[in-house]
Amino acid sequence: RPPRPPPRGTPPRRHSFRKHLYLLRGLPGSGKTTLARQLQHDFPRALIFSTDDFFFREDGAYEFNPDFLEEAHEWNQKRARKAMRNGISPIIIDNTNLHAWEMKPYAVMALENNYEVIFREPDTRWKFNVQELARRNIHGVSREKIHRMKERLESDLM
């Protein structure tokens, strides 16, 4: 027999998530990594996953190569998926995430693993100031590149 429906007037059952995925987004230099570290300070069990990690050499130097960007994103998604399967919470994704399609794989795997997805952007005064972003970003992304990224940033996602 199928289960009986709840009596009339019964409030809908809300899903209570016990695990959280923070999807950070913002231009280079906007404060994403600082926000990720603050979240990790607030939640000491948190793990931070960034596609940028793929480009750090063993000696700690950052060496970005756009030819490997797709592989780097797949690598980061695989790490996040493994952490979700292990029930780690919260998980923090520290990527630029300029477009919805960049966040979708993380959101899908989060829902498949019963995680609440929380979207966050740094709330810094300079988050759209191209000159300041170029000065502050830790990977040497040029002002021109940040300007192009800013033009492509989907602003109505949150």
Put a short name on every predicted segment:
Residues 6, 13, 112-158:
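Conserved GTP-binding G-domain of TRAFAC-class P-loop NTPases and closely related GTPase folds
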Residues 12-18, 84:
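Phosphate-binding P-loop
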Residues 34-86, 128-132:
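Conserved substrate/cofactor phosphate-moiety recognition/catalytic segment
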Residues 31:
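Conserved glycine(s) of the Walker
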Residues 21:
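Walker A (P-loop) ATP-phosphate-binding motif of ABC ATPase nucleotide-binding domains
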Residues 24:
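Hydrophobic anchor at the beta1->P-loop junction of P-loop NTPases
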Residues 67-118:
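Glycine-rich phosphate-binding loop used to anchor ATP phosphates in small-molecule kinases
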Residues 1-8:
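Long, basic/Gly/Ser/Thr-rich N-terminal segments
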